[in-house]
């Protein structure tokens, strides 16, 4: 007999339309409305990347691809998909409540972030657990999946494909910048989070398995809180690497993200490219995983290892 289970796919969320921008960022800032200047800056950034971030549609596509792959991988389980977002509807709590209404008593949760931190994955899981406890729903959480061979294979392939576009005699003058979303240092230290070590491990695995000679780790998209965040910032890192080594080619792999969205399309493709243009170096940024079978397969393999 086929067992029915929920698959709760959790993500940060993104505005669907321009009128969502203010409530979305108010939620991010714990109820504090952004100023008109901050709001205009955000609207300008979205306009710069061609309109609202494609994240919403990509998140839906990733969730659909994942539930489809899981239902092929498990002959005796039928997974029903639920999407829960942190900062915009459908919220995580809405998704868990809907599970209860549908008679789901057991579910797997997956956050669309490959590395674990209490700030992201941990806080999402906590919100899901608190809501699930009201209904007696048992949740099994995927904590991370960056170590899965298919995840590393995806990025290794992309690095090698990018290197193939660069003349071989320039490979020694090429550096790979591996990055993730920065987080407040105090939070990482207080919770003894493995987040920085997981990014370092990801970079090491990519270096071991790809043809890249030089690699550096950076952080990006930090918030404006007035407190120290993880560094170095990728823009500062780019300048420092150029000053020390005169690299001609910079390849950026924001491996902490899983699709093209504002942080990649603006913070990398605009801000990092501006620095590269300024120092006279070439900017490269391979395609993000999105719904690539290796990426979806990595999450399926992680689920198989815990369930």
Curated annotation (Swiss-Prot):
Gene encoding the protein: cpfC
NCBIfam families named in the record: hemH (TIGR00109), PRK12435.1 (NF009095)
GO process terms (BP): heme biosynthetic process
Chain residues that bind Fe-coproporphyrin III: 12, 29, 45-46, 53, 124
Pathway: Porphyrin-containing compound metabolism; protoheme biosynthesis
Organism for this UniProt entry: Staphylococcus aureus (strain MRSA252)
Chain positions recorded as Fe(2+) binding sites: 181, 263
HAMAP family: Ferrochelatase
Gene3D superfamilies found in the cross-reference section: 3.40.50.1400
Primary role: Involved in coproporphyrin-dependent heme b biosynthesis. Catalyzes the insertion of ferrous iron into coproporphyrin III to form Fe-coproporphyrin III.
Keywords: Cytoplasm, Heme biosynthesis, Iron, Lyase, Metal-binding, Porphyrin biosynthesis
Protein name: Coproporphyrin III ferrochelatase
């Amino acid at each position: 007999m086929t067992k029915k289970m929920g698959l709760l796919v959790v993500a940060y969320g993104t505005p669907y339309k321009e009128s969502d921008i203010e409530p979305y960022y108010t939620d991010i800032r714990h109820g504090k409305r952004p100023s008109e200047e901050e709001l205009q800056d955000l609207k300008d950034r979205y306009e710069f990347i061609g309109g609202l971030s494609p994240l919403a549609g990509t998140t839906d596509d990733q969730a659909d691809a994942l539930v489809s792959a899981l239902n092929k991988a498990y002959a005796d389980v039928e997974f029903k998909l639920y999407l829960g977002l942190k900062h915009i509807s459908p919220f995580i709590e809405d998704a868990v409540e809907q599970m209860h209404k549908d008679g789901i008593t057991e579910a797997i949760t997956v956050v669309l972030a490959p590395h674990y931190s209490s700030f992201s994955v941990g806080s999402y899981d906590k919100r899901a657990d608190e809501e699930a406890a009201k209904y007696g729903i048992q949740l099994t959480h995927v904590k991370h999946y960056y170590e899965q061979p298919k995840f590393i294979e995806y990025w290794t392939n992309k690095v090698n494909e990018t290197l193939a576009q660069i003349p071989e005699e320039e490979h020694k003058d090429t550096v790979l910048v591996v990055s993730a979303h920065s987080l407040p240092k105090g939070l990482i230290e207080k919770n003894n989070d493995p987040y920085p070590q997981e990014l370092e491990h990801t970079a090491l695995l990519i270096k071991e398995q790809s043809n890249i000679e030089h690699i550096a780790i950076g952080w990006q998209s930090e918030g404006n809180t007035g407190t120290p965040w993880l560094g170095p910032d990728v823009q500062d890192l780019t300048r420092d690497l150029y000053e020390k080594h005169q690299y001609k080619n910079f390849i950026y792999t924001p491996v902490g993200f899983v699709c093209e969205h504002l942080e990649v399309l603006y913070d990398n493709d605009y801000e990092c490219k501006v620095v590269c243009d300024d120092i006279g170096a070439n900017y490269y940024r391979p395609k993000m995983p999105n719904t690539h079978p290796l990426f979806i397969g990595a999450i399926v393999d992680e689920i198989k290892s815990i369930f």
